[in-house]
């Protein structure tokens, strides 16, 4: 057909001579008025030639007289007789079929028969192609239009097609009784299956029916009507009966139409509107209806006879059109002009029509029966006689009324409706032709078996079936090109966009090769009988695949595939609908208020430009054009998948998912809208019963004429797409696709015409768009795609990009994406058929493996076309809802996100194949690990080892399917970064931060992080963190504050520029001009309460108040005056007076002022009020102004000041924290830091961690400490350590690095000599491990080195420098050394200049210093470092030579951090870094336990014998010590064998740092175990008794059970180079008096060890005498030689010449002693009396030393020099008490409590000064007998050193020298060899 105009101007159903409205009304009345029988109408008077006014009246007469013009002569259609049980028994069903078939044309106008539509279209087309018959054509078109007008008088709104509306209206008429026969002509030429019904036609004609009702008992059309219908109803019921009888009996056309009419009749086969299942109608005894239209032929015999050349046959009346071959053979015109006058086919039709005129008379006997049946079926009384049908009719009428309120409107709108109807008819014809393939839309074709309409025609569900929740979604009409039109999809669009009528030739592109090329339609019987299918539960059957007419009807899986055609079993592709009773075909409408399926356009998208799409289950025999997407494996779940958006009526905004979200309302059958009897409206469209694929989503691809921009009106049913409710029920009533493959092919084809609103409404279904992003695929138009598809693509292109489509899912396997890209039509995204969408979310029950992604962006086509969001790729298969993965689609049974995207076949096999079980017992494994499973191991250094099992199929005889043998797969090792590439930032963190050179890099990194935080936007909403957005902003501010600190070298203030910069950071919104304003101007709004409380203004001039105030002051009652001023709001007076009074009064006055004046304002004055409180000194109470205590207590207080009650949330004051902070920073006051701390605590209590930390930083009074420190305010910036649900936040790299940056700013940049955060070293180690795990081993090694350096450099080790930390650093370093470096894996490291130069200088220095021979002589050089295991850390040497700075030497002492701590806690760390120690660290170890493994589980630190503590002090100096792991004061002590907790005597330095003011004894020890040695700050009186005597000490030692060497304080220490004469004299004295005076009892001399002590003393004495003699002799010789020689010349040389030019003679003296180099002049001489060398320049050296005697000769010196801790001198010598020494050497760490000593004499141990926390030896002070008697130095632990070892005697060369005062102890050993 050419253009819509043709249809609008001529319609074969209309009399050309009659006015459109008149003809339409008459025709409608005739069709609807069973009483107006064509047989009774005078043949000539009534009808004029449809082709012109001058046409033969005879033709018209014959048309009316002919019972029912059948197909061309060669395809005669026998007249249905009453005898035909199927026909007579079911005339209503036939009528309903006729009525509903047009629905396919008009989205909702189901009353239009497809044949009618085709008739209209063919006639219009023919007329347009017959210029000589322009007038006739125009008249004919007028006839069609007027008929449509008459029909759509009620359907004025939506049902505008001629003929279509007749049927539709008939279906809708609740009073429409079942007709006995068809009255009138059943013309398929223009879709005018005008089956005159014996019922009131008021529902169609409205006015006209009323006019004729007077003459007709049942509203028959009056014979008075002019024109075509004038005489049809002259005789009332009799005429109608005659007419029907004629229809039944007439075998030949009553009238032979002229050639022109014959041509139109020839066109009838072309216009097979059979989407309506004319077979079904025919099978149902539709000849009654056919007769109704046969009677019409009497008036329009020429035209209708041409169209219906069927010859009546006995038996059931069937209108069998010519076979395609016959039609083509007789037709010599092109498809565009099928009705050529010269064509033999036209002549045949004319002849047949002429013959049928006589037949009309023969059928009259059955007309009465038909009329009776019509009356019974269609009359209002029918409701009583036929309850189900009656209800259906009533509901049908209600639904129609509801949907089409204007359905019964005036005929004035019928013209427009006719045009639309014609267009829709064309659409339906296209769709129906494909499905029915019958040239006629005639309901019955005798050639077609009646019983087979089930198989041929889509199952016409019973009313109960229809009400079972099947959404009455008429398939979206497809464009003319729709590959396969569907009975159901072809529904007249309610508001069709004026589209030109298209010829069948055009439709051939979509599947029509010619108007007659539908032989499959004749084979309707082939279609399996479809029994009424109760709508399966959604769980039982998946929703039908998307109705894509372009998709060949899938052979639906019986259980899964939804019936392609409504009423068709899923396995029946045939489109024929089983003829049901009238009510079954007319689905009962659900509650009228819900949706009106009968509505012309709401229910089905308006296929304005193209014929409606064919239903999914179009008979496969129909040559449906190949669906371009049919090959796509995507199984469209909803027939609406390929709907023509322009053709679609824009449905009401309904929940697109409602149909699928809720299981199809199985309980209540849904009455399909008149428009789509196969897509019954879901009952009421309840949430749970949303219609599944609705007609408007029918897959009809829009013709190229489809205008994407003009979305059809929303179909409230169509807008309800698939639901996620699971496998949708198979909808036998809903033909959703003509392609049998559509059930199994996943198709995302989306007609662009669907309104955008539908897209918006879909989300309402509760299906949030899938989180996964949809892969982008460029649109690809399949080759099979017909013109319609092309048009669709054209329309779709603008909407190729769909913003609604979520971003591609990066995790979706590429294989899956590619697969969809290959098989998904490009239009999918643009034209998402709602039908498809409807079903899309209900995957078949069997498709459990795939859980369809939440439907995303499956908007209605119109939405996609109109939506501005159409910016995403057209092919977005994952975007499709589950429709992309059709429930019944076997092609996609696996999760699309499964990484291994194997082929479909492989997937199927892998899921079904069995494994070969092992026979070795592994088959009993309940976990079935023998089947294999992927194994992934994350190794050190960022290495990932993976192994995936191999499944090898094994075939065996007798088995069709193989079995799987699981074998280990290949082991792969790859860097973690290859699998999970880290999100690399532009700027790398420059850590570790060692020096100021890193400042620039650090600032760049901080800036990049801040920018990243700002760009990432607000984090997703977390209900557990309602303030997540605020916290995000505060986090950014915290980072900015740290950056500010770095920029300004850790200073927050100090310059105006710095403060200005800080304000700009904290208040970026403030104007720069505010700096020039009065302070606080920026907060003026909060400080201007003038407008409030005008009744009592402050400082009001009240003379009486002033006088009273003056009187009080005169009397000296200032306080009374103050409060009087306050009461009278004389704030100025009150404050002035209060300023002179006690500060408490001032605070109260200000507080009152704030409460009454500041807080009473309505503006946000919390910050100002808090600031005033701070200024007033109410520091702690200032936060109450932000959040009142009542609010913090959870109470809501009502203010009586403003009288408004709780007008706002009391917690809103928290939002003023920033303003408060700004006020404080800009106006510093003495105690404002306390206020800031309080503010921070307040914020922290409410979870505002970042804001709290900002306040802490700014306050400069916050405590940074370990997590175990209860007083620590901050552990890591941004982490609330008080509310840690896990330790994960403590491992956050950002927090660690930010805290490190803060430390860097406040220490390195600020010039602090030490790191301010010693506890942070442990977190740095955590970060180093994290770097190693990421494969950044070089950076991790740098951190290890930095940590080790910090530990070595710490002169005052912190308690956090615990063994855990040392061991962790050592372990990580060792592992890093063992692994290949980042640069390469070579064993030989590449040398660098730094390494080379460093090694050279090191060797040079060692050579100059004479240390180069140490390695060679001792073999302790680097030799062992060679080889692959050189860097493998092994067990440290048992007796390592101690080093003052050695980390291993230092960490055992675990020195507590010294801090001049004024905190309230006695264990408060010095720098407010609370030390921590585990309980294990408090455990002491006896010397016997020194070799036992550490309680920490790693090798214990190598301790020197001098370290071994003596009897542990019986007190817990560190009670309450944090458990972070800091060692006890005694350092790392051996665990006593007997007790689990027995702290030994702490090292002096540690005890000094940590001794609490009032220590308590350890619970496990008795006072007897108290060590005579007391730390500097130890308060002995806490024990309540003086130190024990020697016996007590001995007893305690015995009780301990461990061997403790005797302690003389610091143990044995090698002598200094500077020989102290006093020491020598002491030695002499001791030696001379050795025998006389009793030996000082040492630890070894106590009790049981008397004999041992005696032997040791004897040995020592003998050894000492020997050494003295040797030394004296050697030195004497050397001195004499020196005296004889001049001073060595080398002494006068410079250091360089001294190094290289000096003579080494003195060093060549074999085994002689090495002469000490004492300078240019030897000032030493040997004093024989004193028996030692004396310095002549030191007069005091000649005085005898009164120190303790040397240790027994038997005791070997300690392995390490303990020069830092000389043994304490006996108290008798008057050695200053330890407290004094400790105070001078180290600050007290006690909380403000000065060290105290007991009144008892200080033990000799107190004489030892506090050790320098440098080496373990310094902290290993051993107790001496409390009596002060000098005892032998303690014998070193035998396990750690050898007494006879010269190395032990000499000790480390770097041993530090002790104070000169302590040198006297060592004066005895002046042997230079010691140095």
Curated annotation (Swiss-Prot):
Q: Name one GO cellular component term.
A: endoplasmic reticulum membrane
Task: State where composition is biased (Polar residues).
Answer: 273-290, 322-360, 413-428, 454-466, 1434-1443, 1531-1541, 1563-1572, 1587-1599
CDD domains (alphabetical): ACE1-Sec16-like
Q: What protein is this chain from?
A: COPII coat assembly protein sec16
Family membership: Belongs to the SEC16 family.
The gene designation is: sec16
Composition bias type Low complexity, residue spans: 596-607, 660-674, 853-868, 1484-1495, 1775-1785
Q: Which organism is it from?
A: Aspergillus clavatus (strain ATCC 1007 / CBS 513.65 / DSM 816 / NCTC 3887 / NRRL 1 / QM 1276 / 107)
Extent of Acidic residues compositional bias: 378-391, 399-409
Provide the protein's localization: Endoplasmic reticulum membrane
Q: Where is the composition biased (Pro residues)?
A: 539-559, 692-702, 766-781
- Taken from the record, one Pfam family name reads Sec16
The membrane-spanning stretches of this chain are none
Q: Which GO terms describe its biological process?
A: autophagy; Golgi organization; intracellular transport; protein localization to endoplasmic reticulum exit site; protein transport; vesicle-mediated transport
Name the PANTHER family for this protein: RGPR-RELATED (PTHR13402), SECRETORY 16, ISOFORM I (PTHR13402:SF6)
Q: Outline the segment boundaries, as ranges, of region: Disordered.
A: 34-140, 211-241, 258-814, 835-868, 1413-1443, 1475-1717, 1733-1875
Answer whether the UniProt record assigns the keyword RNA-binding to this protein.
no
Where is there biased composition of kind Basic and acidic residues? Answer: 93-116, 214-223, 503-512, 1661-1683
Its biological purpose is as follows: Involved in the initiation of assembly of the COPII coat required for the formation of transport vesicles from the endoplasmic reticulum (ER) and the selection of cargo molecules. Also involved in autophagy.
């Amino acid at each position: 057909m050419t253009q819509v105009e043709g249809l609008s101007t001529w319609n074969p159903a209309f009399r050309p001579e009659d006015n459109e409205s008149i003809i339409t009304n008459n025709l409608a009345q005739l069709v609807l008025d069973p009483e107006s029988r064509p047989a009774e109408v005078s043949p000539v008077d009534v009808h004029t030639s449809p082709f012109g006014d001058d046409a033969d009246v005879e033709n018209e007469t014959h048309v009316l007289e002919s019972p029912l013009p059948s197909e061309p002569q060669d395809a005669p259609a026998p007249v249905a007789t009453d005898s035909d049980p199927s026909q007579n028994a079911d005339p209503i069903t036939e009528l309903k079929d006729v009525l509903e078939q047009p629905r396919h044309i008009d989205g909702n106008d189901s009353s239009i028969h497809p044949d009618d539509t085709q008739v209209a279209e063919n006639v219009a087309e023919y007329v347009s192609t017959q210029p000589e018959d322009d007038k006739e054509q125009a008249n004919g078109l007028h006839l069609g239009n007027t008929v449509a007008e008459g029909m759509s008088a009620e359907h004025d709104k939506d049902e505008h097609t001629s003929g279509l509306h007749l049927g539709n209206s008939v279906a809708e008429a609740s009073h429409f009784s079942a007709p006995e026969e068809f009255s009138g002509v059943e013309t398929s030429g223009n879709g005018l299956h005008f089956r005159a019904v014996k019922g009131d036609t008021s529902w169609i004609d409205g006015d006209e029916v009323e006019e004729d009702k007077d003459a007709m008992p049942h509203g028959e059309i009056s014979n008075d009507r002019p024109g075509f219908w004038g005489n049809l109803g002259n005789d009332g019921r009799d005429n109608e009966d005659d007419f029907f009888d004629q229809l039944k009996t007439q075998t030949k056309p009553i009238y032979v139409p002229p050639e022109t009419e014959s041509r139109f009749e020839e066109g009838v086969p072309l216009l097979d509107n059979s989407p309506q299942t004319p077979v079904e109608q025919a099978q149902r005894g539709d000849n009654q209806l056919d007769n109704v239209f046969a009677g019409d032929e009497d008036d329009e015999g020429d035209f209708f006879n041409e169209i219906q050349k069927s010859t009546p046959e006995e038996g059931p009346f069937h209108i069998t059109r010519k076979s395609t071959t016959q039609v083509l053979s007789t037709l010599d015109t092109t498809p565009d002009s099928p009705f050529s006058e010269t064509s033999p086919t036209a002549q045949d039709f004319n002849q047949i029509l002429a013959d049928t005129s006589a037949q009309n008379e023969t059928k009259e006997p059955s007309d009465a029966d038909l009329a009776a049946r019509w009356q019974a079926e269609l009359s209002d009384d029918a409701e009583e006689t036929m309850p189900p049908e009656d209800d259906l009719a009533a509901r049908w009428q209600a639904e129609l009324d509801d949907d089409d309120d204007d359905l019964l409107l005036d005929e004035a709108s019928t013209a427009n409706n006719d045009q639309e109807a014609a267009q829709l008819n064309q659409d339906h014809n296209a769709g129906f032709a494909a499905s029915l393939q019958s040239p006629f839309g005639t309901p019955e074709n005798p050639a077609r078996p009646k019983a087979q309409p089930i198989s041929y025609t889509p199952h016409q569900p019973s009313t109960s079936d229809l009400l079972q929740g099947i959404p009455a979604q008429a398939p979206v009409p497809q464009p003319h090109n729709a590959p396969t039109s569907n009975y159901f999809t072809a529904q007249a669009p309610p508001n069709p966009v004026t589209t030109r009528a298209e010829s069948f030739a055009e439709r051939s592109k979509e599947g029509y090769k010619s108007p007659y090329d539908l032989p499959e339609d004749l084979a309707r019987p082939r279609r399996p009988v479809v029994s009424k299918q109760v709508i399966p539960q959604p769980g039982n059957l998946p929703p039908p695949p998307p109705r894509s007419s372009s998709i060949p009807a899938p052979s639906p899986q019986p259980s899964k595939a939804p019936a392609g055609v409504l009423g068709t079993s899923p396995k029946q592709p045939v489109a024929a609908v089983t003829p049901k009773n009238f009510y079954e075909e007319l689905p009962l409408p659900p509650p009228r208020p819900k949706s009106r399926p009968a509505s012309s356009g709401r229910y089905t998208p308006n296929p304005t430009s193209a014929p409606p799409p064919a239903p999914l289950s179009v008979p496969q025999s129909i040559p449906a054009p190949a669906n371009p997407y049919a090959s796509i494996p995507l199984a469209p779940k909803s027939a609406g998948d390929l709907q023509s958006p322009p053709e679609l009526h824009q449905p009401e905004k309904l929940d697109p998912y409602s149909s699928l979200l809720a299981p199809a309302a199985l309980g209540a059958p849904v009455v399909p809208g008149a428009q789509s009897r196969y897509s019954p409206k879901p009952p009421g469209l309840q949430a749970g019963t949303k219609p599944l694929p609705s007609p408007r989503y029918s897959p009809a691809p829009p013709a190229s004429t489809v205008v994407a921009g003009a979305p059809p009106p929303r179909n409230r049913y169509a807008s309800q797409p698939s639901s996620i409710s699971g496998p949708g029920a198979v909808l036998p009533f809903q033909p959703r696709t003509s392609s049998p493959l559509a059930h199994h092919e996943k198709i995302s084809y989306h007609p662009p015409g669907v309104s955008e609103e539908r897209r918006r409404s879909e989300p309402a279904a509760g299906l949030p768009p899938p989180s996964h992003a949809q892969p982008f695929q460029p649109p690809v138009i399949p080759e099979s795609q017909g013109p319609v598809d092309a048009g669709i693509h054209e329309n779709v292109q603008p909407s190729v990009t769909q913003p609604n489509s979520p971003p591609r899912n990066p995790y979706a396997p590429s294989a899956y994406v590619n697969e969809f890209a290959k098989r998904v039509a490009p239009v999918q995204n643009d034209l998402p058929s709602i039908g498809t969408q409807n079903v899309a979310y209900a995957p078949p029950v069997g498709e459990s493996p795939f859980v369809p992604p939440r439907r995303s962006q499956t908007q209605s086509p119109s939405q996609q076309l109109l939506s501005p969001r159409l910016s995403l790729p057209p092919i977005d298969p994952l975007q499709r809802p589950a429709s992309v993965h059709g429930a019944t689609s076997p092609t996609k049974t696996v999760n699309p996100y499964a990484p291994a995207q194997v082929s479909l076949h492989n997937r199927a096999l892998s899921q079904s194949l069995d494994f070969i079980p092992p026979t070795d017992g592994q088959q009993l494994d309940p976990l079935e690990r023998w089947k294999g499973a992927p194994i992934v191991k994350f190794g050190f250094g960022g290495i990932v080892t993976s192994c995936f099992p191999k499944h090898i199929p094994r075939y065996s005889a007798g088995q069709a399917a193989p079995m799987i043998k699981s074998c280990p797969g290949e082991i792969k090792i790859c860097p973690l970064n290859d699998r999970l590439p880290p999100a690399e930032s532009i700027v790398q963190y420059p850590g570790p931060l060692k020096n100021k050179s890193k400042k620039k890099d650090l600032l760049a990194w901080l800036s990049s992080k801040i920018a990243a935080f700002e760009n990432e936007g607000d984090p997703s909403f977390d209900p557990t963190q309602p303030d997540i957005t605020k916290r995000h902003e505060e986090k950014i501010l915290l980072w900015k504050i740290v950056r500010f600190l770095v920029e300004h070298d850790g200073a927050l203030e100090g310059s105006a520029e710095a403060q200005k910069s800080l304000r700009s950071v904290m208040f970026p919104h403030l104007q720069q001009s505010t700096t020039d304003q009065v302070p606080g101007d920026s907060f003026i709004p909060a400080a201007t309460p003038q407008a409030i409380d005008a009744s009592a203004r402050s400082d009001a001039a009240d003379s009486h108040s002033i006088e009273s105030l003056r009187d009080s002051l005169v009397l000296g009652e200032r306080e009374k005056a103050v409060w009087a001023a306050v009461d009278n709001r004389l704030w100025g007076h009150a404050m002035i007076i209060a300023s002179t009074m006690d500060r408490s009064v001032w605070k109260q006055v200000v507080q009152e002022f704030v409460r009454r004046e500041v807080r009473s304002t309505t503006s946000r004055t919390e910050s100002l009020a808090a600031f005033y409180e701070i200024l007033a000194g109410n520091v702690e109470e200032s936060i109450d102004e932000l959040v009142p205590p009542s609010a913090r207590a959870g109470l809501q207080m009502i203010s009586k000041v403003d009288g408004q009650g709780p007008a706002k949330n009391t917690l809103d004051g928290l939002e003023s924290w920033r303003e408060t902070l700004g006020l404080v920073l800009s106006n510093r006051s003495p105690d404002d830091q306390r206020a800031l701390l309080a503010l921070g605590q307040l914020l922290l209590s409410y979870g505002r961690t970042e804001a709290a930390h900002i306040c802490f930083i700014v306050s400069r009074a916050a405590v940074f400490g370990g997590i175990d420190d209860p007083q620590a305010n901050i552990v890591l910036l941004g982490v609330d350590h008080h509310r840690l649900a896990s330790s994960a936040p403590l491992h956050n790299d950002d927090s660690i690095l930010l805290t490190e940056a803060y430390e860097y700013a406040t220490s390195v940049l600020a010039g602090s000599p030490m790191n301010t955060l010693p506890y942070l070293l442990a977190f740095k180690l955590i970060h180093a491990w994290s770097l190693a795990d990421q494969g950044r081993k070089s950076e991790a090694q740098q951190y290890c080195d930095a940590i080790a350096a910090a530990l070595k450099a710490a002169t005052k080790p912190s308690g956090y420098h615990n063994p855990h930390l040392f061991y962790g650093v050592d372990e990580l370093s060792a592992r890093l050394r063992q692994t290949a470096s980042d640069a390469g894996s070579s064993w030989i490291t590449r040398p660098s200049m730094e390494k080379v130069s460093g090694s050279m200088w090191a060797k040079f220095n060692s050579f100059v210093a004479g240390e180069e021979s140490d390695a060679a002589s001792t073999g302790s050089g680097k030799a062992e470092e060679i080889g692959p295991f050189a860097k493998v850390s092994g067990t440290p040497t048992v007796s390592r030579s101690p080093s003052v700075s050695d980390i291993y030497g230092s960490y055992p002492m675990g020195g507590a951090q010294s801090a001049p701590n004024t905190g309230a806690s006695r264990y408060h760390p010095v720098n407010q870094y609370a030390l921590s120690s585990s309980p294990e660290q408090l455990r002491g170890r006896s010397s016997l336990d020194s070799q036992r493994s550490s309680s920490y589980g790693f090798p214990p630190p190598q301790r020197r014998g001098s370290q071994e503590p003596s009897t542990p002090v019986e007190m817990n100096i560190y009670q309450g010590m944090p458990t972070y792991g800091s060692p006890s004061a005694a350092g790392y002590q051996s665990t006593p064998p007997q007790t689990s907790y027995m702290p030994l005597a702490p090292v002096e330095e540690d005890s000094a740092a940590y001794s609490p003011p009032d220590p308590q004894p350890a619970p496990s020890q008795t006072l007897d175990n108290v060590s005579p040695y007391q730390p500097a700050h130890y308060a002995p009186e806490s024990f309540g008794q003086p130190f024990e005597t020697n016996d007590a000490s001995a007893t305690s030692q015995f009780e301990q059970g461990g061997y403790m060497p005797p302690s003389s304080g610091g143990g044995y220490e090698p002598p200094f180079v500077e020989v102290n004469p006093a020491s020598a004299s002491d030695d002499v004295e001791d030696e001379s008096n050795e025998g006389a005076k009793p030996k000082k009892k040492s630890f070894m001399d106590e009790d049981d060890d008397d004999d041992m002590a005696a032997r040791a003393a004897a040995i020592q004495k003998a050894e000492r005498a020997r050494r003295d003699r040797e030394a004296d002799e050697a030195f004497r010789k050397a001195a004499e030689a020196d005296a004889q020689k001049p001073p060595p010349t080398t002494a006068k040389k410079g250091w360089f010449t001294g190094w290289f030019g000096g003579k080494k003679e003195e060093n060549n003296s074999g085994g002689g002693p090495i002469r000490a180099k004492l300078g240019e002049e030897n000032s030493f001489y040997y004093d024989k009396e004193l028996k030692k060398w004396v310095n002549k320049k030191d007069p005091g050296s000649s005085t005898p030393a009164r120190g303790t005697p040397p240790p027994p000769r038997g005791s070997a010196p300690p392995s390490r020099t303990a020069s830092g801790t000389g043994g304490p001198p006996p108290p008798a010598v008057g050695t200053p008490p330890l407290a004094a020494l400790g105070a001078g050497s180290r600050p007290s760490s006690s909380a403000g409590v000065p060290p105290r000593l007991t009144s008892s004499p200080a033990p000799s141990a107190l004489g030892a000064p506090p050790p320098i926390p440098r080496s373990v030896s310094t902290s290993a002070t051993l107790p001496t007998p409390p009596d002060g008697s000098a005892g032998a130095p303690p014998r070193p632990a035998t396990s750690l050193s050898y007494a006879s070892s010269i190395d032990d005697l000499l000790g480390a060369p770097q041993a530090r020298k002790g104070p000169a005062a302590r040198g006297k102890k060592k004066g005895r050993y002046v042997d230079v060899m010691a140095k």
